[in-house]
Regions:
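Bacterial N-terminal signal peptides that target proteins for export
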Residues: 1-9
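Bacterial N-terminal signal peptides
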Residues: 9-19
């Protein structure tokens, strides 16, 4: 528990210091893609777990189960592993991104459960989708330092 609390504090500091996880979020015009994607803990979701597809991350931490939903269908959906590679000269973290799971579409009617890797100060779990302009968008799944809920934040890839 102490380790998780410390992780939440470091996460909050990281968000405060970096203004988000990546320059993509900080420098782009707000686009509805992020607001159409939703993530929450399985215990807080209003879904039938037996009806959901489950994706298990390598080195998954069994209690850490997130549900990803969307309000629209997104093509080229991926569950990705994120590893911090470096912090850019501008102070933004840059991640190595490894695809763990691919699905042609994340459908609004088909939530997906992700059994996540344990995460400390930076997100280690994420999702990627193709937006309406055909661009790949990568979002880290992070734990809020305020209330422990899950957050999506756009990240930069290596």
């Amino acid at each position: 528990m102490r380790k998780r609390f410390l992780g939440a504090i470091l996460l909050a500091l990281g968000i405060g210091l970096f203004g988000g996880w990546g320059s993509a979020q900080a420098n782009s015009v707000a686009e509805p893609t992020q607001s159409m994607l939703h993530v929450c803990w399985l215990k807080d979701a209003h879904v039938n777990p037996a009806a959901c597809e489950v994706v298990r991350m390598p080195d998954a931490f069994e209690p850490a189960k997130a549900v990803v939903t969307s309000s629209v269908d997104f093509p080229d959906f991926q569950v990705v592993a994120l590893d911090l590679r470096e912090v850019s000269a501008d102070g933004y973290p840059v991640f190595n991104v490894q695809s763990i799971y691919y699905k042609d579409f994340l459908r609004a009617t088909e939530p997906i459960i992700i059994v996540m890797r344990d995460s400390e100060s930076f997100p280690r779990n994420g999702i990627a989708v193709r937006d309406s302009l055909g661009r790949e968008r990568i979002f880290g799944i992070a734990i809020s330092g305020e209330d422990g809920s899950l957050l999506l934040s756009e990240v930069d890839r290596n």
